């Protein structure tokens, strides 16, 4: 514990990815992807849908559709279905609530930096009892103006509360680490 405390003393703020880091959202994401691909007539037998956990939706759908209109249609179908059903099929990982409480009590600025749109992730964090621990909930935009993890991280870092602060990014995917490095 002391070693961890010494490491954390180098930071003022911590950015967290959400899916796969704080919340196990895989069941809802996978069910929603299955529904969208079925609706759009895409055969996904043999496709490991877990690989789509994390990357932006348009990037994932771009692997199956070349027409931008179809990518947008798939993205819209996904968001509509996920908001109604998939977003409720998630659970906070064990220990996350206590960790956030401890970090908040220690005075860290806590933020999210997720590829999920802010409009989508905020109600999920509220439903799971986590929103209260975050000073800023940062996510992708609904349009393509802030779609990549790098763009999301830059957006979060541009917030006034983080100016001049030493910030640590915590995530579970390569996209999280690339977004922090860029």
Task: Outline where the language-model segments fall.
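A short, basic/flexible loop-to-alpha-helix module at the beginning of a structural domain
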Residues: 2-6
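Glycine-rich phosphate-binding loop signature in dinucleotide/nucleotide-binding domains
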Residues: 7-9, 105-108, 159-166
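N-terminal helical cap/lid subdomain that shapes the substrate entry/recognition surface
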Residues: 7-98, 102, 119-122
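Acidic di-acidic motifs
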Residues: 25, 171-172
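Short helix-capping segments at alpha-helix termini
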Residues: 39-43, 68-70, 106, 129-133, ...
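Short, flexible loop segments at the rims of nucleotide/cofactor-binding pockets, characterized by
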Residues: 87-90, 115, 144-145
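Short beta-strand immediately N-terminal to the catalytic nucleophile in serine-hydrolase-like folds
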Residues: 113, 170-171
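Substrate-recognition "cap/lid" segment bordering the active-site pocket of phosphatases
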Residues: 118-168, 174-182
